[in-house]
């Protein structure tokens, strides 16, 4: 067909393109979901058991999408001793829109001012919770294209998930993840193995430009999420089976071939149901299911149709039970951030990846295939996979990325819990002020984590000014350094002390390529 390569053609790409480094940011305070149940007057366990949520992170009016992304980017650059001139592409995935024209990416360029690096491609990508994954694919495609200049790509996924008072509010959260993409990575994107499904649906959307709150069709949203998973998994299985056949292996792909399986997580219970859903797909596709012990007791469901089972409690219960061991082995650990911080929209699935990397050693991760299901309402979804490098030696890229996340649980534990009424007051404050001009935020600066960027003011022309809460390493800085405003050329951010040049030319050498709340 037009545009396709001949079967005998060889394409060349940089070697092992993938995730080189990962940084995650979440706010310094949370509300306990058990306490929120009491405050909301609902049955005990509705949020903690029914949704599977323990705590929900939130931010005051001191933080917005720009400050979240500035924080996670600068943290990644500093923790990895990177120079700002080693970034050649920067793209943001978000659905938290505070300006209909100016991108979050352009705000992030303030961090690059001192380096003088303005030659950075990419802008923002938006489709509910899928924008981060679309940005990741764009980054990979850039590195594997003739446009690549040998530098890293940086992807930022971040959101503030807030809901009006009611059943959906406990499925909120806040967070941002930054992913450094490049060759010779410890987490490698498997080429040709993406199963994508896109369709038109009004399951979750935000048409009101004056409100942060979405319009949600809860039942439709659950159906859309699960049906997209069915479609994506089916396409992925066909593609990897075709690859295996070329290698002389005719076995069918199943859940057992994933070392880990992570999901976009609006709430933890949906993720558990989703893994069970994948087992249902395996069951229906297995011509020898009677000989497989994992399907023992499921014989009665041999003739069900996938499209008839989205709300079938008997099917759901049976396959959740049958997949319980698989869930414990492959998915449960990925829910650390989701359970403790809530839904982070575009960054949710990458928070799940961070959770896995934080809880397993390089030796336990080496060689594993990580399945990744990304979903965004409206809708767009992809199931793809990462292959972990085999090199788990001390000082290896895999050792470095896991070491950088080893403090994830302690960081979550270091947050401050606040009473539900204080949380509600903050939500009301956001609702009343997020669109105001000539506004100075009321939230405490001292309560923020050190190194957090925050909103100083919004002027009469809606222009936003930010500052960074000092870190111990900032003691020698002059007072006022760290205050940035896009219209003041003299204000800047100090770059990391250690300068790292662009990727060496050798790295670019090619190698022959043979919910009831809305699940967005």
From Swiss-Prot:
<dbReference type="GO" id="GO:0006695">
    <property type="term" value="P:cholesterol biosynthetic process"/>
</dbReference>
<dbReference type="InterPro" id="IPR013528">
    <property type="entry name" value="HMG_CoA_synth_N"/>
</dbReference>
<feature type="binding site">
    <location>
        <position position="171"/>
    </location>
    <ligand>
        <name>(3S)-3-hydroxy-3-methylglutaryl-CoA</name>
    </ligand>
</feature>
<feature type="modified residue" description="N6-acetyllysine">
    <location>
        <position position="46"/>
    </location>
</feature>
<feature type="modified residue" description="N6-acetyllysine">
    <location>
        <position position="273"/>
    </location>
</feature>
<feature type="binding site">
    <location>
        <position position="221"/>
    </location>
    <ligand>
        <name>(3S)-3-hydroxy-3-methylglutaryl-CoA</name>
    </ligand>
</feature>
<dbReference type="GO" id="GO:0006084">
    <property type="term" value="P:acetyl-CoA metabolic process"/>
</dbReference>
<keyword id="KW-0753">Steroid metabolism</keyword>
<keyword id="KW-0443">Lipid metabolism</keyword>
<keyword id="KW-0152">Cholesterol biosynthesis</keyword>
<feature type="modified residue" description="Phosphoserine">
    <location>
        <position position="4"/>
    </location>
</feature>
<feature type="binding site">
    <location>
        <position position="269"/>
    </location>
    <ligand>
        <name>CoA</name>
    </ligand>
</feature>
<feature type="active site" description="Acyl-thioester intermediate">
    <location>
        <position position="129"/>
    </location>
</feature>
<feature type="active site" description="Proton donor/acceptor">
    <location>
        <position position="264"/>
    </location>
</feature>
<feature type="binding site">
    <location>
        <position position="273"/>
    </location>
    <ligand>
        <name>(3S)-3-hydroxy-3-methylglutaryl-CoA</name>
    </ligand>
</feature>
<feature type="binding site">
    <location>
        <begin position="44"/>
        <end position="46"/>
    </location>
    <ligand>
        <name>CoA</name>
    </ligand>
</feature>
<feature type="active site" description="Proton donor/acceptor">
    <location>
        <position position="95"/>
    </location>
</feature>
<dbReference type="Pfam" id="PF01154">
    <property type="entry name" value="HMG_CoA_synt_N"/>
</dbReference>
<comment type="pathway">
    <text>Metabolic intermediate biosynthesis; (R)-mevalonate biosynthesis; (R)-mevalonate from acetyl-CoA: step 2/3.</text>
</comment>
<feature type="binding site">
    <location>
        <position position="43"/>
    </location>
    <ligand>
        <name>(3S)-3-hydroxy-3-methylglutaryl-CoA</name>
    </ligand>
</feature>
<feature type="binding site">
    <location>
        <position position="221"/>
    </location>
    <ligand>
        <name>CoA</name>
    </ligand>
</feature>
<dbReference type="GO" id="GO:0042803">
    <property type="term" value="F:protein homodimerization activity"/>
</dbReference>
<keyword id="KW-0597">Phosphoprotein</keyword>
<dbReference type="InterPro" id="IPR000590">
    <property type="entry name" value="HMG_CoA_synt_AS"/>
</dbReference>
<keyword id="KW-1207">Sterol metabolism</keyword>
<feature type="binding site">
    <location>
        <position position="273"/>
    </location>
    <ligand>
        <name>CoA</name>
    </ligand>
</feature>
<feature type="modified residue" description="Phosphothreonine">
    <location>
        <position position="476"/>
    </location>
</feature>
<protein>
    <recommendedName>
        <fullName>Hydroxymethylglutaryl-CoA synthase, cytoplasmic</fullName>
        <ecNumber>2.3.3.10</ecNumber>
    </recommendedName>
</protein>
<keyword id="KW-0444">Lipid biosynthesis</keyword>
<feature type="modified residue" description="Phosphoserine">
    <location>
        <position position="495"/>
    </location>
</feature>
<feature type="binding site">
    <location>
        <position position="167"/>
    </location>
    <ligand>
        <name>(3S)-3-hydroxy-3-methylglutaryl-CoA</name>
    </ligand>
</feature>
<comment type="similarity">
    <text>Belongs to the thiolase-like superfamily. HMG-CoA synthase family.</text>
</comment>
<dbReference type="GO" id="GO:0006629">
    <property type="term" value="P:lipid metabolic process"/>
</dbReference>
<dbReference type="GO" id="GO:0005829">
    <property type="term" value="C:cytosol"/>
</dbReference>
<feature type="binding site">
    <location>
        <position position="44"/>
    </location>
    <ligand>
        <name>(3S)-3-hydroxy-3-methylglutaryl-CoA</name>
    </ligand>
</feature>
<feature type="binding site">
    <location>
        <position position="129"/>
    </location>
    <ligand>
        <name>(3S)-3-hydroxy-3-methylglutaryl-CoA</name>
    </ligand>
</feature>
<feature type="region of interest" description="Disordered">
    <location>
        <begin position="492"/>
        <end position="520"/>
    </location>
</feature>
<feature type="binding site">
    <location>
        <position position="264"/>
    </location>
    <ligand>
        <name>(3S)-3-hydroxy-3-methylglutaryl-CoA</name>
    </ligand>
</feature>
<dbReference type="GO" id="GO:0004421">
    <property type="term" value="F:hydroxymethylglutaryl-CoA synthase activity"/>
</dbReference>
<keyword id="KW-0752">Steroid biosynthesis</keyword>
<feature type="binding site">
    <location>
        <position position="167"/>
    </location>
    <ligand>
        <name>CoA</name>
    </ligand>
</feature>
<dbReference type="GO" id="GO:0010142">
    <property type="term" value="P:farnesyl diphosphate biosynthetic process, mevalonate pathway"/>
</dbReference>
């Amino acid at each position: 067909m037009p545009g396709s390569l001949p079967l005998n053609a060889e394409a060349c790409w940089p070697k092992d393109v993938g995730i080189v480094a990962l940084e995650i940011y979440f706010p310094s305070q949370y509300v306990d979901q058990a306490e929120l149940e009491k405050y909301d007057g609902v049955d005990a366990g509705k949020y903690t058991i029914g949704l599977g949520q323990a705590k929900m992170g939130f931010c005051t009016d001191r933080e917005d999408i720009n400050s979240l992304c500035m924080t996670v980017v600068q943290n990644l650059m500093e923790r990895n001793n990177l120079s700002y001139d080693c970034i050649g592409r920067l793209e943001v995935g978000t659905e938290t829109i505070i300006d209909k024209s100016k991108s979050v990416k352009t705000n992030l360029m303030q961090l690059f001012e001192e380096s003088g690096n303005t030659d950075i491609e990419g802008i923002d990508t938006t489709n509910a919770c899928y924008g981060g994954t679309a940005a990741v694919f764009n980054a990979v495609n850039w590195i594997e294209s003739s446009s690549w200049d040998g530098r890293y790509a940086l992807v930022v996924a971040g959101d503030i998930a807030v809901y009006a008072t009611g059943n959906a509010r406990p499925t909120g959260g806040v967070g941002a993840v930054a992913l450094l993409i490049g060759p010779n990575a410890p987490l490698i994107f498997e080429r040709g193995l993406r199963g994508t499904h896109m369709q038109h649906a009004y399951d979750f959307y935000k048409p009101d430009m004056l409100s942060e709150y979405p319009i949600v069709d809860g039942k439709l949203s659950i159906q859309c999420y699960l049906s997209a998973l069915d479609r994506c998994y089916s396409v992925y299985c066909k593609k990897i089976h075709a690859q295996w056949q070329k290698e002389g292996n005719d076995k069918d792909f199943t859940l057992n071939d994933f070392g880990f399986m992570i999901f976009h997580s609006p709430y933890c219970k949906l993720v558990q149901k989703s893994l069970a859903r994948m087992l249902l797909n395996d069951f229906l596709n297995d011509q020898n299911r009677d000989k497989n012990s994992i399907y023992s007791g499921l014989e009665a469901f041999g003739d069900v149709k996938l499209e008839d089972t989205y709300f079938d409690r008997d099917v759901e219960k049976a396959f959740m039970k049958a997949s319980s061991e698989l869930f414990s082995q492959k998915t449960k650990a990925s829910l650390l951030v989701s359970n403790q911080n809530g839904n982070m929209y575009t960054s949710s699935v990458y928070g799940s990846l961070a959770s896995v990397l934080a809880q397993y050693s390089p030796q336990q991760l080496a060689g594993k295939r990580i399945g990744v299901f990304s979903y965004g309402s409206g809708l767009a979804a992809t199931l793809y996979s990462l292959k972990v490098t085999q090199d788990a030696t001390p000082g290896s890229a895999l050792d470095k990325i896991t070491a950088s996340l080893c403090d994830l649980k302690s960081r979550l534990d270091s947050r401050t819990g606040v009473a539900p009424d204080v949380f509600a007051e903050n939500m009301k404050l956001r609702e009343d002020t997020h669109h105001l001009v000539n506004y100075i935020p009321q939230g405490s600066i001292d309560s923020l984590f050190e190194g957090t960027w925050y909103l100083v003011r919004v002027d009469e022309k809606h222009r936003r000014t930010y500052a960074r809460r000092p870190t111990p390493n900032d003691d020698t800085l002059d007072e006022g350094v760290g205050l940035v405003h896009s219209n003041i050329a003299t204000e800047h951010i100090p770059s990391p002390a250690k300068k790292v040049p662009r990727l060496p030319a050798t790295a670019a050498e090619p190698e022959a390529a043979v919910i009831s709340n809305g699940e967005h």
